[in-house]
Structures are given as C-alpha cells and as structure tokens.
C-alpha cells in the first residue's frame, strides 16, 4: 500500500499504487443550477457508446433527481453508510477530512494481501464497496422530480429573505469522474483498468478483463458496469477519440442548457488562472468535487445549486459549499469583483472545441483552443431591442415587441 496525497481531502491516504499523475488530466465542471434534466446528454452518450447487446442497462451518462433519485439505486446511500462518520476539520483556513476513505475503511494490511497466484483477493474485496444487484440498474429515472422539504399549501410562498426554498430538488448529471486515484483501477485484480498518461482518461482493457467485477465493487459512483453478454466490465471512455482531436465529449457538445465545461485540471500548486477548469476550481473556488470524502480525487466538479440547504450539500460536495454558493450568486448578480467569473460562466458550453484558455474583456468573453486560436466569443450583456407596438409600414400591430 502506498501513501498518496489527495488535495481534495487535505491529507495523505492509502492507495494500492504509488502516486503517478498523468501529463494532463481530463477534467470538467458542471453548473447544475442550469441543468433541466432534458436527458439530451444521456441519449447522446447512449446512442454513441452503449447501444449494443448486454448494454441495455448501461448509462455512462445519467441525470438523477436529488435527493431521492439514484442510478444504480441508492448508490450514494450505500457507500456513505459503509464509510461511517465523515467529519472535516478546519486548519488554517483549509479543510482536512478525518474519516476513512474507501481505501482505509476496512483497515486492511495491504502489504500482506493474497499472493499473485490468487488474483481475485488481491485488491478489490479489500476496498470498501459493493456490487449492485441487477435490479438496481433497472430504474434510471427513479425519484425523478420528487421534492424534499415542506408540503406546499395554498398560502405557501417563498419570501425574498429566504436563502433556500422550503421545498426543493435538483438535477445531478453524472459521468465517470476519471479519478486521480480511481477505485476501479485499484480494485482490478488483473490490472485491466488503467489511466492514460497523455490525458488521464481511465479505461478498461477488455482483452485483459477476466470478469471478476471487482472494478464494479470498487467504484463508489457506480460508473463501472458489467456486460453479461460480453463477460467484461465496461465504462465511460471520456470520448477519447474526440478529446484527441481537441473536441469536447458527446454529452458536453449536446448539452442544451450549456452547463458543461470540458478541459484539463491541474493540482492546486500548478493551477493556471487562464485555464477555465483551473479557474473555476482553484481560483474562484466555485466548483466542488462530488463526495470528496470517498478518497478518489474525482475530476468532475460541480457548481452547487443555490436553492438547496447547505446541510445536504456539504455531505455531497464538502465543507466549502456556502462560500461557493455566495461567490456564484455574486457573479450572477454582476458584482464587478467577479466579472471574470461571470464571463467564464457565459462562455460555458458555447463551442464544440475544448477551450484551453479564456479571457474576459469589457464587452465579451473569449475562448481559445490549444493553438491559441479563437473558438468562442460571447457577449457579457445580451443586446435587447424593443420594436414599436404599431408597424406603420405593414399597417399592423405587433404581438411581440421585445
């Protein structure tokens, strides 16, 4: 067992392999305040990657309604229950996770694990996790649009001074996080799961897979899925053919709400403020990882929903939720201090090309590709035009004048 540093939890932790970060790390930010659960992302992924035999139950991209929706069923409740108490300690303005990660919860002496001639017991079953039942994959829309909170009566209203709504839900779009310390890679007894050095995408070598399903057990996010027809595990491939061409993945390109930004994510000490993902995660600190306490250092980040109580969101995104929500709201209000963030939020989802650098001027936000070529321009303020109610040239009244 190696000791690796996980910056998301502020400490070193146990992991089956030594720390070895790739040259670049595939990363993403989702603004879930804008997600409408249209499932266009889900269908674009499904029709591209998982329309074969044995893949009927697979959704490498899915959108679930929180707090009650989940695919597979109760994936998050299952792993959180198994981890026990998950407390954070604040230390000089930074947060340190004091609970166990999935690699530490079973208190295994990894140096005395089973020998190489007994591969099934080498890693997977020592990582805290579970294999979902086949029925757990059968209800991808379970809990859709079901709210939590108070029951609305005829006189229920939302006052201006309420920070969150008395009744709430939100949509959580999910893909593979292509984690820095991937549970699926740590759990595979035959090392069929690997991380690409050139972009950090986590893939399964299906020719090497021996169907132990330990990657399924070891992925707490439920994103490694077994194909019973092919007798192999399969997962999101990060749309690597598109990424290699400088394009964003299918689910990003087809997102109607423009909630997704794809790019490269660096560790905090190597952050580049002109890099959109680095800026949202490290500079503005408005985008947060999903269940960082699990210990995988996931590389998909979320701007938390402003209408949801902090207690629920802290469990999901960590202790910086309140600050992230405040910063996001200030940017959306137009506070001058957050003009750069506001410009980047406008730029999200505006091009099929990967934006590697961005700039914000008084008039517009501009995105550049890896060659420094402009691939997107969006105005900071949308122009508005008001037409006369009566059109004298056509001798007609207009029904829509804005």
Where are the regions that the model predicts?
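Non-ligating segments of multi-cofactor redox enzymes
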Residues: 1-402
């Amino acid at each position: 067992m190696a000791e690796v540093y996980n910056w998301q939890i502020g400490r070193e932790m146990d992991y089956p392999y030594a720390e070895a970060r790739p040259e670049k790390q595939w990363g993403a930010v989702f603004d879930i305040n804008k997600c409408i659960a249209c499932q266009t992302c889900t269908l674009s992924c499904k029709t591209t990657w998982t329309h074969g035999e044995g893949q009927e139950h697979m959704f490498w991209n899915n959108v679930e309604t929180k707090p009650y929706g989940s695919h597979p069923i109760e994936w998050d409740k299952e792993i959180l229950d198994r981890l026990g108490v998950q407390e954070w300690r604040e230390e000089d303005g930074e947060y340190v996770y004091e609970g166990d990660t999935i690699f530490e919860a079973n208190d295994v002496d990894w140096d005395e694990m089973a020998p190489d001639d007994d591969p099934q017991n080498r890693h997977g079953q020592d990582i805290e996790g579970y294999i979902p039942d086949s029925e757990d994959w059968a209800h991808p829309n379970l809990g859709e649009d079901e709210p939590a909170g108070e029951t609305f009566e005829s006189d229920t209203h939302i006052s201006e001074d309420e920070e969150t709504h008395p009744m709430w839900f939100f949509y959580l779009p999910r893909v593979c996080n292509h984690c820095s310390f991937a549970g699926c890679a740590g759990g595979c007894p035959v090392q069929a799961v690997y991380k690409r050095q050139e972009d950090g995408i986590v893939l399964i070598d299906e020719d090497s897979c021996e169907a132990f399903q330990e990657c399924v057990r070891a992925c707490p996010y439920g994103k490694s899925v077994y194909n019973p027809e092919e007798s192999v595990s399969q997962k999101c491939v990060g749309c690597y053919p598109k990424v290699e061409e400088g394009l964003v993945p299918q689910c990003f390109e087809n997102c109607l709400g423009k909630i997704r930004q794809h790019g490269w994510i660096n560790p905090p000490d190597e952050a580049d403020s002109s890099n959109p993902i680095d800026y949202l995660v490290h500079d503005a600190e408005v985008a947060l990882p999903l269940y960082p306490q699990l210990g995988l250092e996931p590389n998909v980040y979320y701007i938390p929903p402003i209408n949801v109580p902090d207690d629920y969101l802290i469990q999901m995104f960590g202790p910086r939720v309140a600050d992230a929500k405040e910063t996001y709201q200030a940017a959306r209000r137009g506070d001058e201090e957050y003009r750069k963030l506001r410009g980047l939020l406008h730029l999200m989802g505006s091009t099929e090309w990967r934006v590697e650098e961005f700039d914000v001027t008084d008039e517009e936000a501009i995105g550049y590709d890896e060659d420094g070529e402009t691939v997107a321009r969006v105005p900071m303020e949308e122009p508005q035009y008001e037409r006369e109610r009566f059109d004298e040239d056509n001798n007609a009244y207009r029904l829509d004048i804005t």
